[in-house]
Amino acid sequence: MKTSKTVAKLLFVVGALVYLVGLWISCPLLSGKGYFLGVLMTATFGNYAYLRAEKLGQLDDFFTHICQLVALITIGLLFIGVLNAPINTYEMVIYPIAFFVCLFGQMRLFRSA
């Protein structure tokens, strides 16, 4: 149990650091850095809100659909931002993977608690 929680924390932190530090170095403008930080914060908040409501047993169809809509919009914004950012091709693959690793680690961390 403790090992899975440690792995979940590690996934969350490493995913967030690779995503944020990599894009911080790659994006020359502060607005681009803020854009990618906002995308990550929106995704982690939506993920947290859904998991918390699920844990408390307060899920209904409307809330689930809102969380799915926020997730789809956030993922769309991530891919549009990555495609328009002045980064290399391999970075266009690494940063979305780090984004999803961060969200997966957050989900595993919340469910292991």
UniProtKB/Swiss-Prot annotation:
Residue ranges that the UniProt entry lists as topological domain Periplasmic: 21-33, 83-84
Location of this chain's protein in the cell: Cell inner membrane
Membrane topology: Multi-pass membrane protein
Highest taxon, organism lineage: Bacteria
A GO cellular component annotation in the UniProt record: plasma membrane
Spans traversing the lipid bilayer: 10-20, 34-51, 62-82, 85-105
Keywords of the record: Cell inner membrane, Cell membrane, Membrane, Transmembrane, Transmembrane helix
Family annotation (Pfam families): YiaAB
Alphabetical GO biological process terms: DNA damage response
Residues on Cytoplasmic side: 1-9, 52-61, 106-113
Main location: membrane
Protein name: Inner membrane protein YiaB
InterPro entries: YiaA-like (IPR038972), YiaAB (IPR008024)
